[in-house]
Amino acid sequence: MGQILLILLLQLIYVPVLTLRTIMLVKGKTVIAGLFGTLETLIYIFALGIVFQDLTTVGMIVYAVGFGLGILLGGFVERKLAIGYNMIQVHTKEYPAELIQQMRDNGYGVTHYQGQGRDGVRYRLDVLAARTRMKELRELVEKHEPKAFLVAFDPIDFKGGYMMKGLRRPK
């Protein structure tokens, strides 16, 4: 019974570490990804060694269930850490002057454009925001432009501009 619980525990550690390693690699943080990869491999070998010592159906099922639960836990950890930034496009029918000002007052850098949509003139705002501030930004948009269309992208790299100063919360 002790080994079964150990297998489950190791999987609940292993998969979130795997998740974090993948995120760090995608975000370009290769040194941190390498450290997570080393830890991930140690846990993997240790857990598999325990399973192979006693090839019971229960051990294999617990290993698989632990992996599935680890994915859920890894996703939860990823959402809580919210590492990185999002580039958000806000599309509106009317020129959103008040929203633009509120965003700037709240420390966001905003670039706005006018374009031609199928049914007439449309406006697009480009806003770079830390993922930890996404909920706050969505609420701000919802308050001022409830019918706005939002699209979020994960930028791989960026440099310069107001962005660097604007990513911090206003004091």
UniProtKB/Swiss-Prot annotation:
Pfam families: DUF2179, DUF5698. It is a multi-pass membrane protein. InterPro entries: DUF2179 (IPR019264), DUF5698 (IPR044035), UPF0316 (IPR022930). GO terms for cellular component: plasma membrane. The chain crosses the membrane at residues 4-24, 32-52, 57-77. The keyword Membrane applies. The keyword RNA-binding does not apply. Disulfide bonds: none annotated. It is found in: Cell membrane. Keywords: Cell membrane, Membrane, Transmembrane, Transmembrane helix. Belongs to the UPF0316 family. This is UPF0316 protein EAT1b_0871. It comes from Exiguobacterium sp. (strain ATCC BAA-1283 / AT1b).
